[in-house]
Structure formats: structure tokens, C-alpha cells
Amino acid sequence: MAMTAEVKDELSRLVVTQVSSRRAEVASLLRFAGGLHIVSGRVVVEAEVDQGSIARRLRKDIFDLYGYNAVVHVLSAGGIRKTTRYVVRVAKDGEALARQTGLLDLRGRPVRGLPAQVVGGSVADAEAAWRGAFLAHGSLTEPGRSSALEVSCPGPEAALALVGAARRLGVSAKAREVRGSDRVVVRDGEAIGALLTRMGAQDTRLTWEERRMRREVRATANRLANFDDANLRRSARAAVAAAARVERALEILGDTVPDHLAAAGKLRVEHRQASLEELGRLADPVMTKDAVAGRIRRLLSMADRKAKTEGIPDTESAVTPELLEEA
């Protein structure tokens, strides 16, 4: 099941006992999935959704909360309609329902955003508003570079109201107009997870987070694999160059090299692939990596000074293109 369908399936089965939250969900669902129509001079309320469980939930809530009977019409897939759709319609008491849910104001004019009682309601009402909006026109993409939780909105006012509701929940959401359609988008992974939990889709959040973590691990592994060969080549060349310079330094200094510098140099030559930290552990007594690096620097510096004085090739002369090619 796609992530969007999983979220909607879980939300449609969520048990909500608080009346104000149930009212906020119904109002939001009707606002984002529906519309008001005038049929034979009467106001008809309609909401079109993509799952039968959502339609049944809405019909039940309308009856439980307002006492009105809603009819569910099934629009089977076919022609330009790719999937089966469900239309919840209240005809006989449409105007009364529209007024009670806040779709119409006191003067009988359509409300363009979310109803005032939802906007000014509790945090639980804000959660319910998001739940209703997502059940109506929400989508959740698989975790990835362009993962997003989106809700298509009936207009900019409704989009801004939904952004405000998200802000009350501590979630950053943005209103966007995409190809003439108003949308509210949440892109941050942590914010998406938090919003799923707030809406009541905790199980789906866990699934989404698991897939997100797996994808991040794979992406990290791919990045490491892409750079691994280059890093290994660079490391190998650096090790070969360092060992060659140290060998040349020991040749230049001969018996005049101080014992402690000679010991550090021999460690570098004998353990070409070891890190400075590993060389420090191999030393007797044990040294820090900074101490090892310092002794090797002094060894090379001493040898280069002597080479310059005597007019002979210095330690850099040991690092030839042929040597690096072989690394």
C-alpha cells in the first residue's frame, strides 16, 4: 500500500471522542474535499474522497454530531477516472449543515478559509483540522531527497489557515501555488513525522521513519562508495610519498640521525599504510599521533637542511612521478 493510502487508512480508523475535535475534522474535511451547490434552489453539501472508509467515517460523524443523513455515491473507475471515488452528499439539510459546520457564515455567504471555530479552537482542534484536510486531499511521498507531505487546498485562504494550524502544532508548513493549484507543503523529515503523529497516524509514521532511515543509510553507503576509491588512491600515494621521503632522510643523515627521530622514521617506513595514531601505538614507549608527526617533520627538515648544505638531492627528490604511478 502506498504511503498516502496507509496514512488515510489509519486516520479513517482513528477513534476520536472529543466532540469539538470531531466537529473540526468534519468541517475541515468538507471544506477541503467538498463544495456547496445550489440544486433546485436548495444548498447541497458534497465531499468527494478516495477511500470508502473515509466516506463512511464522514457519513457517521455527520449523523452523530448533527443528526443529518448523508448519502454515499460510488463513482467507479473508468474512462478519465483512474480510481474509484466516493461522494458524500447531504441534500435535504444541506444549508443547515453548511451553517453548523462553518461552511456558510451568519449571512449565508461561503467561508473561504477554515471556519472561525476551528481556527480559534484548541490544539486538538488544529490536529483534527489537519486530519480532515489530509483525508480530503493529502498525500505523503516515500522518504527521499524530495519527500513531502502535501495537502491540495480549495484556495489561498484555506491554505493559509492550514499553515496557521500547523504552526500551532509546532510544525513549519509553507503555502505554495503550483500550476494554478494552492497547496500546503511540509518537507522537513522530522516535521513530517511529528505531523503524522499529531494527526493520529503513529503506526504509519513508524513505517515512514524506518524507510527514511534505510534510505539515508543506503545514500551514505553510496556516497562513501563513490569517494572510497579516490580516497584510497590519495591515501596510498600519500603513504608511499611519506615513506620515500623518510627513507631518503635516513640515507642523507646516516649515523648522525638522533635515535628518537630514527625510530619514528623506521616506523613510517615499515608500516606504510598505518595512520599516525597507529604508528604511535606501535612505538616503544607509546606516543601520541602529534608526537609521531612532529618527529617525522623534524627528521625531514634536518635531512633537507643537510642536503642543501652539501648540495645533494633532498627528501623531495625521492618522490618521483613513477613512484606515485605505481602506488
From Swiss-Prot:
Pfam families reported in the protein's UniProt record: HTH_WhiA, LAGLIDADG_WhiA, WhiA_N
Similarity remark: Belongs to the WhiA family.
BP-aspect Gene Ontology terms: cell division; regulation of sporulation
Gene: whiA
Name of the protein this chain belongs to: Probable cell division protein WhiA
InterPro entries: Homing_endonucl, Sporu_reg_WhiA_N_dom, Sporulation_regulator_WhiA, Sporulation_regulator_WhiA_C, WhiA_LAGLIDADG_dom
Keywords, ordered alphabetically: Cell cycle, Cell division, DNA-binding
DNA-binding region: 275-308
Tree of life domain: Bacteria
Physiological role: Involved in cell division and chromosome segregation.
Annotated region described as Disordered, given as residue ranges: 307-327
UniProt GO MF annotations: DNA binding
Gene3D superfamilies in the cross-refs: Homing endonucleases (3.10.28.10)
Keyword S-adenosyl-L-methionine: no
